[in-house]
Protein backbone atom coordinates (compact mmCIF):
# COMPACT_ATOMS: atom_id res chain seq x y z
CA UNK A 1 0.00 0.00 0.00
CA UNK A 2 1.33 3.45 -0.98
CA UNK A 3 2.26 5.97 1.68
CA UNK A 4 -0.41 8.70 1.72
CA UNK A 5 1.57 11.81 2.60
CA UNK A 6 0.24 15.15 3.78
CA UNK A 7 1.69 16.74 0.63
CA UNK A 8 -0.31 14.35 -1.56
CA UNK A 9 -3.51 15.10 0.34
CA UNK A 10 -2.81 18.83 0.05
CA UNK A 11 -2.29 18.59 -3.71
CA UNK A 12 -5.56 16.69 -4.16
CA UNK A 13 -7.41 19.26 -2.04
CA UNK A 14 -6.01 22.10 -4.14
CA UNK A 15 -6.99 20.38 -7.39
CA UNK A 16 -10.50 19.33 -6.36
CA UNK A 17 -11.63 21.69 -3.58
CA UNK A 18 -12.81 18.65 -1.59
CA UNK A 19 -12.37 18.21 2.16
CA UNK A 20 -9.26 16.69 3.74
CA UNK A 21 -10.96 13.45 4.84
CA UNK A 22 -12.59 12.97 1.42
CA UNK A 23 -9.20 13.47 -0.26
CA UNK A 24 -7.41 11.08 2.08
CA UNK A 25 -10.10 8.43 1.57
CA UNK A 26 -9.89 8.79 -2.21
CA UNK A 27 -6.09 8.45 -2.15
CA UNK A 28 -6.26 5.34 0.04
CA UNK A 29 -8.78 3.76 -2.35
CA UNK A 30 -6.60 4.64 -5.37
CA UNK A 31 -3.41 3.42 -3.64
CA UNK A 32 -1.84 6.87 -3.86
CA UNK A 33 -2.63 7.43 -7.56
CA UNK A 34 -3.79 11.05 -7.58
CA UNK A 35 -5.20 10.96 -11.14
CA UNK A 36 -7.23 7.84 -10.34
CA UNK A 37 -8.38 9.49 -7.10
CA UNK A 38 -9.65 12.51 -9.05
CA UNK A 39 -11.43 10.25 -11.54
CA UNK A 40 -13.09 8.30 -8.73
CA UNK A 41 -14.11 11.51 -6.95
CA UNK A 42 -15.68 12.81 -10.15
CA UNK A 43 -17.65 9.59 -10.54
CA UNK A 44 -18.86 9.66 -6.92
CA UNK A 45 -19.84 13.33 -7.10
CA UNK A 46 -17.42 14.38 -4.36
CA UNK A 47 -15.85 17.13 -6.48
CA UNK A 48 -19.20 18.52 -7.54
CA UNK A 49 -20.38 18.48 -3.93
CA UNK A 50 -17.24 20.31 -2.81
CA UNK A 51 -17.86 23.05 -5.37
CA UNK A 52 -21.45 23.41 -4.15
CA UNK A 53 -20.40 23.49 -0.48
CA UNK A 54 -19.72 27.22 -0.63
CA UNK A 55 -23.25 27.98 -1.79
CA UNK A 56 -25.65 29.26 0.85
CA UNK A 57 -28.30 26.68 1.76
CA UNK A 58 -31.08 28.79 3.29
CA UNK A 59 -34.17 26.97 2.05
CA UNK A 60 -35.29 23.45 2.96
CA UNK A 61 -37.67 21.63 5.29
CA UNK A 62 -38.55 21.13 8.93
CA UNK A 63 -39.50 17.60 10.01
CA UNK A 64 -40.97 16.39 13.31
CA UNK A 65 -41.64 12.96 14.79
CA UNK A 66 -43.29 11.92 18.06
CA UNK A 67 -43.75 8.50 19.64
CA UNK A 68 -44.89 8.16 23.24
CA UNK A 69 -43.12 10.67 25.44
CA UNK A 70 -40.27 11.40 23.01
CA UNK A 71 -40.28 13.90 20.16
CA UNK A 72 -37.70 15.18 17.71
CA UNK A 73 -37.47 18.15 15.33
CA UNK A 74 -35.03 18.49 12.44
CA UNK A 75 -34.01 21.10 9.85
CA UNK A 76 -32.38 20.11 6.56
CA UNK A 77 -31.40 22.88 4.16
CA UNK A 78 -31.04 23.24 0.41
CA UNK A 79 -30.70 26.36 -1.75
CA UNK A 80 -34.11 26.73 -3.41
CA UNK A 81 -37.79 26.12 -2.73
CA UNK A 82 -37.89 24.00 -5.89
CA UNK A 83 -35.39 21.47 -4.52
CA UNK A 84 -37.07 21.60 -1.08
CA UNK A 85 -40.09 19.95 -2.75
CA UNK A 86 -38.00 17.39 -4.66
CA UNK A 87 -38.88 13.78 -3.82
CA UNK A 88 -35.23 12.79 -3.46
CA UNK A 89 -34.49 15.65 -1.07
CA UNK A 90 -37.63 14.88 0.97
CA UNK A 91 -36.69 11.20 1.17
CA UNK A 92 -33.20 12.14 2.38
CA UNK A 93 -34.63 14.42 5.09
CA UNK A 94 -37.05 11.67 6.19
CA UNK A 95 -34.23 9.14 6.39
CA UNK A 96 -32.14 11.50 8.54
CA UNK A 97 -35.18 12.13 10.77
CA UNK A 98 -35.83 8.41 11.27
CA UNK A 99 -32.18 7.71 12.09
CA UNK A 100 -31.97 10.60 14.54
CA UNK A 101 -35.19 9.51 16.20
CA UNK A 102 -34.25 5.82 16.43
CA UNK A 103 -30.85 6.63 17.94
CA UNK A 104 -32.05 9.65 19.95
CA UNK A 105 -29.29 11.64 18.25
CA UNK A 106 -29.31 15.35 19.04
CA UNK A 107 -25.71 16.08 18.04
CA UNK A 108 -25.97 17.39 14.48
CA UNK A 109 -22.29 16.64 13.81
CA UNK A 110 -22.96 12.95 14.44
CA UNK A 111 -25.80 13.04 11.92
CA UNK A 112 -23.67 14.88 9.38
CA UNK A 113 -20.92 12.27 9.64
CA UNK A 114 -23.42 9.41 9.38
CA UNK A 115 -25.05 10.76 6.21
CA UNK A 116 -22.11 12.47 4.50
CA UNK A 117 -21.79 9.97 1.65
CA UNK A 118 -25.52 10.10 0.89
CA UNK A 119 -25.48 13.89 1.12
CA UNK A 120 -22.59 14.13 -1.34
CA UNK A 121 -24.34 11.80 -3.79
CA UNK A 122 -27.56 13.82 -3.54
CA UNK A 123 -25.71 17.12 -4.07
CA UNK A 124 -24.17 15.65 -7.23
CA UNK A 125 -27.58 14.51 -8.46
CA UNK A 126 -29.64 17.59 -7.56
CA UNK A 127 -27.00 20.25 -8.16
CA UNK A 128 -27.52 22.23 -4.96
CA UNK A 129 -25.73 22.38 -1.64
CA UNK A 130 -27.50 20.41 1.10
CA UNK A 131 -26.92 20.76 4.82
CA UNK A 132 -28.24 18.95 7.89
CA UNK A 133 -28.47 22.11 9.97
CA UNK A 134 -29.91 21.32 13.41
CA UNK A 135 -31.80 18.78 15.47
CA UNK A 136 -33.39 18.89 18.92
CA UNK A 137 -35.64 16.74 21.09
CA UNK A 138 -38.16 17.00 23.91
CA UNK A 139 -39.48 14.47 26.40
CA UNK A 140 -42.65 14.91 28.43
CA UNK A 141 -46.00 13.71 29.69
CA UNK A 142 -47.87 15.12 26.69
CA UNK A 143 -46.10 15.99 23.45
CA UNK A 144 -47.48 17.84 20.46
CA UNK A 145 -46.22 19.23 17.18
CA UNK A 146 -47.32 21.52 14.40
CA UNK A 147 -45.94 22.08 10.90
CA UNK A 148 -46.85 25.19 8.93
CA UNK A 149 -46.21 23.85 5.47
CA UNK A 150 -42.71 22.48 5.79
CA UNK A 151 -41.07 25.78 6.68
CA UNK A 152 -42.06 26.25 10.34
CA UNK A 153 -42.10 23.44 12.88
CA UNK A 154 -42.97 23.41 16.57
CA UNK A 155 -42.49 20.74 19.23
CA UNK A 156 -44.18 21.18 22.64
CA UNK A 157 -43.98 19.31 25.95
CA UNK A 158 -46.88 19.86 28.34
CA UNK A 159 -48.61 18.44 31.41
CA UNK A 160 -52.33 18.06 32.06
CA UNK A 161 -53.30 19.02 28.50
CA UNK A 162 -55.16 17.02 25.87
CA UNK A 163 -53.85 16.60 22.33
CA UNK A 164 -56.16 19.26 20.87
CA UNK A 165 -55.01 21.96 23.30
CA UNK A 166 -51.35 21.10 22.76
CA UNK A 167 -51.87 21.30 18.99
CA UNK A 168 -53.53 24.72 19.32
CA UNK A 169 -50.70 26.04 21.47
CA UNK A 170 -48.16 24.67 19.00
CA UNK A 171 -49.97 26.61 16.28
CA UNK A 172 -49.77 29.70 18.49
CA UNK A 173 -46.01 29.27 18.91
CA UNK A 174 -45.61 28.96 15.14
CA UNK A 175 -47.52 32.20 14.58
CA UNK A 176 -46.41 34.35 17.53
CA UNK A 177 -42.75 33.34 17.94
CA UNK A 178 -42.42 33.44 21.75
CA UNK A 179 -38.84 33.19 22.98
CA UNK A 180 -39.54 31.89 26.50
CA UNK A 181 -42.25 29.82 28.21
CA UNK A 182 -43.10 32.22 31.06
CA UNK A 183 -42.24 35.87 31.87
CA UNK A 184 -40.06 34.73 34.76
CA UNK A 185 -38.03 32.61 32.32
CA UNK A 186 -36.77 35.68 30.45
CA UNK A 187 -33.04 35.78 31.14
CA UNK A 188 -31.49 38.58 33.19
CA UNK A 189 -29.25 39.43 30.23
CA UNK A 190 -32.23 39.95 27.91
CA UNK A 191 -34.09 41.97 30.55
CA UNK A 192 -31.08 44.22 31.22
CA UNK A 193 -30.48 44.84 27.52
CA UNK A 194 -34.12 45.81 26.91
CA UNK A 195 -34.18 47.91 30.10
CA UNK A 196 -31.24 49.99 28.87
CA UNK A 197 -32.83 50.47 25.44
CA UNK A 198 -36.13 51.62 26.97
CA UNK A 199 -34.35 53.86 29.50
CA UNK A 200 -32.39 55.58 26.72
CA UNK A 201 -35.63 56.17 24.79
CA UNK A 202 -37.34 57.61 27.88
CA UNK A 203 -34.37 59.84 28.73
CA UNK A 204 -34.19 61.15 25.16
CA UNK A 205 -37.77 62.39 25.51
CA UNK A 206 -36.53 64.82 28.16
CA UNK A 207 -38.02 63.06 31.20
CA UNK A 208 -36.16 63.29 34.54
CA UNK A 209 -34.28 60.07 35.34
CA UNK A 210 -36.60 59.13 38.27
CA UNK A 211 -39.72 59.43 36.09
CA UNK A 212 -38.00 57.68 33.18
CA UNK A 213 -37.09 54.73 35.41
CA UNK A 214 -40.70 54.34 36.61
CA UNK A 215 -41.94 54.46 33.01
CA UNK A 216 -39.45 51.78 32.03
CA UNK A 217 -40.50 49.49 34.90
CA UNK A 218 -44.02 49.42 33.46
CA UNK A 219 -42.72 48.80 29.96
CA UNK A 220 -40.53 45.93 31.14
CA UNK A 221 -43.51 44.03 32.56
CA UNK A 222 -45.20 44.38 29.19
CA UNK A 223 -42.01 43.31 27.40
CA UNK A 224 -41.53 40.07 29.37
CA UNK A 225 -45.15 39.19 28.66
CA UNK A 226 -44.76 39.84 24.94
CA UNK A 227 -41.73 37.57 24.54
CA UNK A 228 -43.09 34.71 26.68
CA UNK A 229 -45.64 32.11 25.62
CA UNK A 230 -47.93 32.34 28.65
CA UNK A 231 -47.98 36.14 28.54
CA UNK A 232 -49.11 36.41 24.91
CA UNK A 233 -52.74 36.77 23.75
CA UNK A 234 -53.88 33.32 22.57
CA UNK A 235 -54.20 33.46 18.76
CA UNK A 236 -57.36 31.33 18.81
CA UNK A 237 -58.99 33.36 21.61
CA UNK A 238 -57.19 36.75 21.78
CA UNK A 239 -59.26 37.99 24.72
CA UNK A 240 -57.26 35.57 26.91
CA UNK A 241 -53.56 34.96 27.35
CA UNK A 242 -52.08 31.53 26.75
CA UNK A 243 -51.41 31.36 30.48
CA UNK A 244 -55.09 31.93 31.28
CA UNK A 245 -56.17 29.24 28.84
CA UNK A 246 -53.71 26.77 30.33
CA UNK A 247 -54.95 27.56 33.84
CA UNK A 248 -58.57 26.93 32.77
CA UNK A 249 -57.53 23.45 31.62
CA UNK A 250 -55.30 22.75 34.65
CA UNK A 251 -52.46 22.38 32.17
CA UNK A 252 -48.93 23.68 31.84
CA UNK A 253 -46.32 23.98 29.09
CA UNK A 254 -42.95 22.64 30.20
CA UNK A 255 -40.97 23.58 27.10
CA UNK A 256 -41.20 24.20 23.38
CA UNK A 257 -38.90 24.30 20.36
CA UNK A 258 -39.63 26.38 17.27
CA UNK A 259 -37.64 25.94 14.05
CA UNK A 260 -38.11 28.10 10.96
CA UNK A 261 -36.33 27.23 7.74
CA UNK A 262 -33.30 29.41 7.16
CA UNK A 263 -33.71 31.65 10.20
CA UNK A 264 -30.42 33.33 10.97
CA UNK A 265 -28.88 32.39 7.62
CA UNK A 266 -27.89 35.27 5.34
CA UNK A 267 -29.32 34.33 1.95
CA UNK A 268 -27.41 35.80 -0.96
CA UNK A 269 -29.67 37.47 -3.52
CA UNK A 270 -28.08 37.97 -6.96
CA UNK A 271 -29.71 40.05 -9.67
CA UNK A 272 -29.93 38.69 -13.23
CA UNK A 273 -26.98 40.76 -14.51
CA UNK A 274 -24.79 39.51 -11.66
CA UNK A 275 -25.77 35.90 -12.41
CA UNK A 276 -24.88 36.30 -16.11
CA UNK A 277 -21.55 37.88 -15.18
CA UNK A 278 -20.80 35.06 -12.75
CA UNK A 279 -21.65 32.43 -15.35
CA UNK A 280 -19.44 34.11 -17.98
CA UNK A 281 -16.49 33.99 -15.60
CA UNK A 282 -17.01 30.26 -15.03
CA UNK A 283 -17.16 29.44 -18.76
From Swiss-Prot:
Record Pfam families: EF_TS
Region described as Involved in Mg(2+) ion dislocation from EF-Tu: spans on this chain: 80-83
UniProtKB keywords: Cytoplasm, Elongation factor, Protein biosynthesis
GO-annotated cellular components: cytoplasm
Gene3D superfamilies documented for this protein: 1.10.286.20, DNA helicase RuvA subunit, C-terminal domain, Elongation factor Ts, dimerisation domain
Gene: tsf
UniProt xrefs under HAMAP family: EF_Ts (MF_00050)
Organism: Serratia proteamaculans (strain 568)
Localization per Swiss-Prot or TrEMBL: Cytoplasm
InterPro entries hit by this protein: EF-Ts_dimer_sf (IPR036402), Transl_elong_EFTs/EF1B (IPR001816), Transl_elong_EFTs/EF1B_dimer (IPR014039), Transl_elong_Ts_CS (IPR018101), UBA-like_sf (IPR009060)
Function: Associates with the EF-Tu.GDP complex and induces the exchange of GDP to GTP. It remains bound to the aminoacyl-tRNA.EF-Tu.GTP complex up to the GTP hydrolysis stage on the ribosome.
Protein known as: Elongation factor Ts
Record-stated family: Belongs to the EF-Ts family.
PROSITE patterns linked: EF_TS_1, EF_TS_2
GO molecular function, one term: translation elongation factor activity
Source organism phylogeny: Bacteria, Pseudomonadati, Pseudomonadota, Gammaproteobacteria, Enterobacterales
Amino acid sequence: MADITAALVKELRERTGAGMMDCKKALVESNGDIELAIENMRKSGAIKAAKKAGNVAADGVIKTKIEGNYGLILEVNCQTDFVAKDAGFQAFADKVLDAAFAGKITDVEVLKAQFEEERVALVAKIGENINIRRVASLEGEVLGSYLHGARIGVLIAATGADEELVKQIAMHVAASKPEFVKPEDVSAEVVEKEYQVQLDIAMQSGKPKEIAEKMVEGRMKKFTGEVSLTGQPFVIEPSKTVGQVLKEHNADVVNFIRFEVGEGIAKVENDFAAEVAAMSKQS
